[in-house]
Structure formats: C-alpha cells, structure tokens
Curated annotation (Swiss-Prot):
Residues 61-65 are annotated as: G2. It is found in: Cytoplasm. Monomer. Interacts with BrxC. Phosphorylated on Thr-385 in vitro by PrkC in the presence of poly-L-lysine or myelin basic protein, dephosphorylated by PrpC. Keywords: Cytoplasm, Elongation factor, GTP-binding, Hydrolase, Magnesium, Metal-binding, Nucleotide-binding, Phosphoprotein, Protein biosynthesis. The lineage of its organism: Bacteria, Bacillati, Bacillota, Bacilli, Bacillales. GO terms for molecular function: GTP binding; GTPase activity; translation elongation factor activity. This is Elongation factor Tu. SUPFAM superfamilies: EF-Tu/eEF-1alpha/eIF2-gamma C-terminal domain (SSF50465), P-loop containing nucleoside triphosphate hydrolases (SSF52540), Translation proteins (SSF50447). One of its GO terms (biological process) is translational elongation. It comes from Bacillus subtilis (strain 168).
Length: 396
C-alpha cells in the first residue's frame, strides 16, 4: 500500500484529551476519529480498544503508556494523544513527551468535576498547556437541563480557579458513545466540538518563527579564526552577521556577533531550528563560553536561579530513588546540556516526596542559567535520573 503524502497546506496542532478516569476520554478520542473519517474519508477511524491498548514507551527512562492518533478537520491536521491511566497523564505532561498546544477536558455530565479533573487542570496550568476546550460527556444520561447547566458552571468555575478564562472557554455538550455508535444527533456534537477546537485553539507558532536560541554543547577554537560553539538550534534562525548573547553560568551576559555558520563542514548563510551547527563567534575567547550556556537573540531570554516547578519523581521500578526525599535535598538539575546543583524547598504541608509521586517545589540553583516558564529539566543524583520536571514560574 502506497504511503499517503503528508498534506502541509493545512496548519498542524498537537492536542490531547484530559480528565477524570472513566469520564470518556478514550471513547471521545475514538468518536472524533470515526466521525471525521466518516465525513471526509480522510484519516483512520479508530476503535476504542485500538486506542486503549496503548503500548508502553520509555521517555527519558520513564515508562509511559500513550496512544497517538491523527485526524483532520476542514482546516487543520491534528496529532492527538490519549493516555490510559492517570499516572501516564502526570508523567506525559511533566516530561513533555507529548507536547500539547491545547487540550479537550472531558467531564462526565452525570458525575460533574472529580479529583482528577482538578488535578489535570492544575497540571495543564503548571506545564503550560495554553488552551482548554470542554466536552461535557454522557449528556444522553442526563434528562435534567438544569443539572447540565449546573455541571457546566462548576467546570467553568474550576477553570477560572486555575487562571484559565472559565467564562470564555467553549463548552460542548454531547455523548461520545452515542456518536461512536453512529447516532446522527450526537455525531453533530462531535463536529461542534471540533469547530470549537479549530477556532479556539490558535495555530501554534512554529519553532523557526520564534527568537533564536541554541544550547551550547561544545566549544573549540580555530587558530586564526576564533571560537566556535556547537549545538542544535532549539528555535528560531541565525544568520551570519547576527548579534547574539551568551547566557548563563556567568555573572553577566556577553554580546557577540556570529561571523560564520557551518553544518557538516559546509558554510551556510543561515541555520534554523533543528539544525546541528557550529557558530563562529567574533571576539570571544575559549574561556568566555562553555557547555551549558545558550546563545540567544539579545534580550529574549534571561538567566535565573530561582523558580517554582512541577516535578514527577521516578519510581524505584523506573530506576529512581528507593527512599523519599525532604526539603533541602540538593540534587543536580540537568538543563539542556548541563548539570547545576540546586536546593529543593517543598511546599507547605508537604513533609516528604515518595518515589512515583508528583509535586510542586521551589528550587534555588547555585548558579544562574537560561530558563523560562515551560523549560524542561531532569533531576539527577550521581549521574542517574531521579526526577523530571518543568519550570512553572520564575521567582528570581
């Protein structure tokens, strides 16, 4: 069978289903693929058990089960992630294994918001999922219109509590199961949901359009030409003649100009996100730049040493710690290309953190590093990974 060509004319977005266990996330995922396929003939209709039997994957040493499906609407192509278990969501969102540009929060109209509904909203906030659309599921089981309105209000209030615009978030009432069974009245609700997703979740800015940033992996000097920093461009573009800043691990940022860009020993006019390059820097000595710093467009990223983070602590089975840790624990924080020692302060009322838990924490690094909200990191101890986290707020 010939492979279908990937259609680049449509914009692309990554989304996922979130919400409490048994509220219908996987059934909704199956219904979306089935209803959209039935209408356009594009994509693949997936059955519930095809999605539910997601294989385990290992991402940065952490075991996660995730189902990836794809489908398209009139205007967009979507990659959609659905996880079978609650722990899989926690790990997925924190490690960024499945980046989400937006999420569909599934709430059973028969039950209303439940503990994991709240936890997934909080996680979305902390890991930087920017937009949420709500699907009130199982509406075929609720006859009372007032009850539906009550549940909708509860969900909106809950979203507002975590700084999502609860009053403006689209809420679609439907039944994933009825739509999956081919009931036209409920299929229409799936189209209504996808219209809301198309309109409310903006097309993400592509990495190449963002301001330039490259983590430095290695540094060497070329006699007579100067110092070269190598690494993979994380975002944006850089061209010969651009001014860049060297950020992190030093008292102050240093500005320099890129006088050459090389890839695979060939000279380039410019490089963009995803390219592995060597950048020749004007007037920078070998001692003034090191692995773990970043090169960035001036003024776009600043070095910090204190932040709040959402962290998943690896279980013993995943090769993590065998014992809990307490406040003032001092492991290594691995950002992009380097380890920096940091001190952990646990939130009030949290005595200790057990392997396999997730927690919020305050971190104070012993030196500044280029970080921003949404930057991912690993926590390591003696070279092995014991945790995975994401910066939720910069505090200093």
């Amino acid at each position: 069978m010939a492979k279908e060509k990937f259609d680049r004319s449509k914009s692309h977005a990554n989304i996922g289903t979130i919400g409490h266990v048994d509220h219908g996330k996987t059934t909704l995922t199956a219904a979306i693929t089935t209803v959209l396929h039935k209408k356009s003939g594009k994509g693949t209709a997936m059955a519930y058990d095809q999605i539910d039997g997601a294989p385990e994957e290992r991402e940065r040493g952490i075991t996660i089960s995730t189902a990836h499906v794809e489908y398209e609407t009139e205007t967009r192509h979507y990659a959609h992630v659905d996880c079978p278990g609650h722990a899989d969501y926690v790990k997925n969102m924190i490690t960024g294994a499945a980046q989400m540009d937006g999420a569909i929060l599934v709430v059973s109209a028969a039950d209303g918001p439940m503990p994991q509904t709240r936890e997934h909203i909080l996680l979305s906030k902390n890991v930087g999922v920017p937009y949420i659309v709500v699907f009130l599921n199982k509406c075929d089981m609720v006859d009372d219109e007032e009850l539906l309105e009550l549940v909708e209000m509860e969900v909106r209030d809950l979203l507002s509590e975590y700084d999502f615009p609860g009053d403006d978030v689209p809420v679609v009432k439907g039944s994933a199961l009825k739509a999956l069974e081919g009931d036209a009245e409920w299929e229409a609700k799936i189209f209504e949901l996808m219209d809301a997703v198309d309109e409310y979740i903006p097309t993400p800015e592509r990495d190449t359009e963002k301001p330039f940033m490259m983590p430095v992996e290695d540094v060497f000097s070329i006699t007579g030409r100067g110092t070269v920093a190598t690494g993979r461009v994380e975002r944006g573009q850089v061209k010969v003649g651009d001014e860049v800043e060297i950020i992190g691990l030093q008292e102050e940022n240093k500005k320099t100009t890129v006088t050459g860009v090389e890839m695979f020993r060939k000279l380039l006019d410019y490089a963009e996100a995803g390219d592995n390059i060597g950048a020749l820097l004007r007037g920078v000595s070998r001692e003034e730049i090191q692995r773990g710093q970043v090169l960035a467009k001036p003024g776009t990223i600043t070095p910090h040493s204190k932040f709040k983070a959402e962290v998943y602590v690896l279980s013993k089975e995943e090769g993590g710690r065998h014992t809990p840790f307490f406040s003032n624990y001092r492991p290594q924080f691995y950002f992009r290309t380097t380890d920096v020692t940091g001190i952990i302060h646990l939130p009030e009322g949290v005595e200790m953190v057990m392997p396999g838990d997730n927690t919020e924490m305050n971190v104070e690094l012993i030196s500044t590093i280029a970080i921003e909200e949404g930057t991912r990191f690993s926590i390591r101890e003696g070279g092995r990974t014991v945790g995975s986290g994401v910066v939720s707020t910069i505090t200093e």
